[in-house]
């Protein structure tokens, strides 16, 4: 090879490396938020009831059917604290199995609830996805107050035999409407 060709090859290699280096310094692409609307109807089985002074703590196992952006079932645990002034705070968390915006897998869905005389406030968070839901993140709130169905099996939105697998008669049951946004990390 002659000197002009070597210099030309080195120059091309240098420019190629410079372009690759510049591309690596660009910020990561951000996932675009996707609106999420869905509802759930659950079946709750009381595991324990404790009284600590004037406060009552109820722990329940929950199974729920989801319809909308989230389509599938959730199995988890809920802990509700009933305060002497009549307000209720609660936390629930479980594993959701199904599809989210058409993608299949599992993820963890967590809720934090506050029930006061002024109504319900619920915040939900979803993450820790597997399968096609790997990289899923989301959050939002509920729309309006939960609809309580009471003991037995809810009349609509939930089938005690098929969705989720047989759970027997519920100690309590609720239907909740959710809104928020999700994204899938690139």
Protein language model features and the residues they cover:
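Short intrinsically disordered, low-complexity coil segments enriched in acidic
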Residues: 1-3, 25
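Beta-strand-enriched cores of mature, soluble protein domains
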Residues: 32-186
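Sec/Tat signal peptide C-region and signal peptidase I cleavage site
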Residues: 26-31
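Bacterial N-terminal signal peptides that target proteins for export
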Residues: 3-15
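Bacterial N-terminal signal peptides
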Residues: 13-25
């Amino acid at each position: 090879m002659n000197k002009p060709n070597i210099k030309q090859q080195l120059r091309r290699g240098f420019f190629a490396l410079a372009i690759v280096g510049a591309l690596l310094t660009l910020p990561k692409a951000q996932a675009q938020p996707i609106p999420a609307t869905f509802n759930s109807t659950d079946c709750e089985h009381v595991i324990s009831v404790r009284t600590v002074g004037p406060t009552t703590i109820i722990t329940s196992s929950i199974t729920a059917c989801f319809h909308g952006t989230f389509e599938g079932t959730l199995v988890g645990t809920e802990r509700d604290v009933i305060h002497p002034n009549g307000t209720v705070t609660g936390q629930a968390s479980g594993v959701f199995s199904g599809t989210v915006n058409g993608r299949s897998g599992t993820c963890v869905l967590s809720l934090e609830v506050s029930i006061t005389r002024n109504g319900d406030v619920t915040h939900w968070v979803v993450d820790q996805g597997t399968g096609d839901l790997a990289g899923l993140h989301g959050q939002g709130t509920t729309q309006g107050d939960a609809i309580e169905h009471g003991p037995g099996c809810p009349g609509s939105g939930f089938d005690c035999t098929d969705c989720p697998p047989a759970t027997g008669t519920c100690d309590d049951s609720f239907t909740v409407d959710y809104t928020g946004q999700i994204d899938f990390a690139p």
